[in-house]
Amino acid sequence: MSKSPVAIIILDGFGKRAETVGNAVAQANKPNFDRYWADFPHGELKAAGLDVGLPEGQMGNSEVGHTNIGAGRIVYQSLTRIDKAIEEGEFQENKALNNAFTHTKENNSDLHLFGLLSDGGVHSHINHLVALLETAKDKGVKNVYIHAFLDGRDVAPQSSLEYLETLQKAMNDLNYGEIATVSGRFYAMDRDKRWERVEKAYKAIVSAEGEKFEDPIELVKASYANDKNDEFVVPAIITKDGKPVATVKDNDAVIFFNFRPDRAIQLSNAFTDKEWDHFDRGANHPKNIKFVTMTLYNPSVDAEVAFEPIEMKNVIGEVLSNEGLSQLRIAETEKYPHVTFFMNGGRNEEFPGENRILINSPKVETYDLQPEMSAYEVTDALVEDIKNDKHDAIILNFANPDMVGHSGMLEPTIKAIEAVDENLGRVVDLILEKGGSAIIFADHGNSETMSTPEGKPHTAHTTVPVPVIVTKKGVKLREGGRLADVAPTMLDLLGVKKPAEMTGESLIQK
């Protein structure tokens, strides 16, 4: 039977900004997007800060964006939740955190804090690290060591010195805590199974393998001199009196303070997996450690969780399933968890009638080397699916504007957007031919801002609104929309009643 599918099409990191300088979105040749913008109802959506359950002024990100999109409501994000717990004193009494503290006291062992050292608020926040230091000291933990992962991606590429100084000041004020290792997130936070990267971070933390420095600041400066920005700092060891400050040993406790799971899973697995074959963990692999993660990273990570997920009922996938509608989720590796796990409110399993297609992302060092990524392959698979009348609803993500946008390089990002536009045309024209419709929009900004006002590369997400197009003639879109309104709009286009849990509203004016 012929289907007229309704699609959610996410152009990841494709923000809306009037200024064209350093704006890959504005500079790209994108005839298909421009044609849909001219022909169909369009507007903009808020995709940052309070509108997606983040603190005011906080840039949006893919995890948060897809969670809000799928939920059809504003979802209180981990960052906001943990901030609130610290403010209200719940953090200090958190069971999992206190279990880690107790473990070190019972075993006369050390506490190690792993995580991304920045205030980017995408994966972690430095304030949470400072709160952990204060709490551990308050609870009588003797020694605490920090294994700092440098950012340079959700914040400026060379900003780690200020975060190291902030951390140093907090430790000086408390007279407590030391930095033991430093590693760029490229190594410690890989998510693409490039185990040789994770191995470097792991071996620095466990076996003190790597270059040695007495001062983290010197380490970073040496890395800059070597043309390696924060993200790419090779895992290195901090020493005192010629010896490593600390390694993770038998009976120690670890708290991984990243709250976003995807880039914390692999390193956590390296510490917690009983069965392991990705690299040789060596004789120093620590036994009997208490491993605590800030949020639930993945069922594969054997750890206690400080902030368990809040279960969400009636997300888009569940509603479609309950209505007996078939649905497809499709993306390449980099954004596959977003259209599945995050879109389903933190649930790994498919709903009945939900199918998934994963297309592998290209194995290149950085995506500016292959700006088209796997957009053509994703589209080939989807076109085939639509032609065969497989699904009533489609959720598609094009990763390129975000993933290439993170390089801070304008030209490759323009190419990325042009590749996406070509494929967007193939998908949307086919959907229209089938009598279906698409909601085309972004989950957050990035590629519209490729340079800072000083002309330096800008690699982070932004707080700008994102464009939205609904490819249906004869309707009007209301103003003031946000990401939480996308799922209700999809249901509206499908003629399905919105459940009470979805507090977002359809963008289509009644």
Curated annotation (Swiss-Prot):
Binds 2 manganese ions per subunit. GO terms for cellular component: cytosol. Mn(2+) 2 binds at D12, S62, D443, H444. One of its GO terms (molecular function) is manganese ion binding. The active site is at S62. Substrate binds at H123, R153, D154, R185, R191, R260, P261, D262, R263, K335. It holds the Pfam family Metalloenzyme. Coiled coil: none annotated. It catalyses: (2R)-2-phosphoglycerate = (2R)-3-phosphoglycerate. Pathway: Carbohydrate degradation; glycolysis; pyruvate from D-glyceraldehyde 3-phosphate: step 3/5. Its EC number is 5.4.2.12. Keywords: Glycolysis, Isomerase, Manganese, Metal-binding. GO terms for biological process: glucose catabolic process; glycolytic process. Its cofactor is Mn(2+). Mn(2+) 1 binds at D402, H406, H461. HAMAP family: GpmI. Catalyzes the interconversion of 2-phosphoglycerate and 3-phosphoglycerate. Monomer. Belongs to the BPG-independent phosphoglycerate mutase family. This is 2,3-bisphosphoglycerate-independent phosphoglycerate mutase. It comes from Listeria welshimeri serovar 6b (strain ATCC 35897 / DSM 20650 / CCUG 15529 / CIP 8149 / NCTC 11857 / SLCC 5334 / V8). The gene is gpmI.
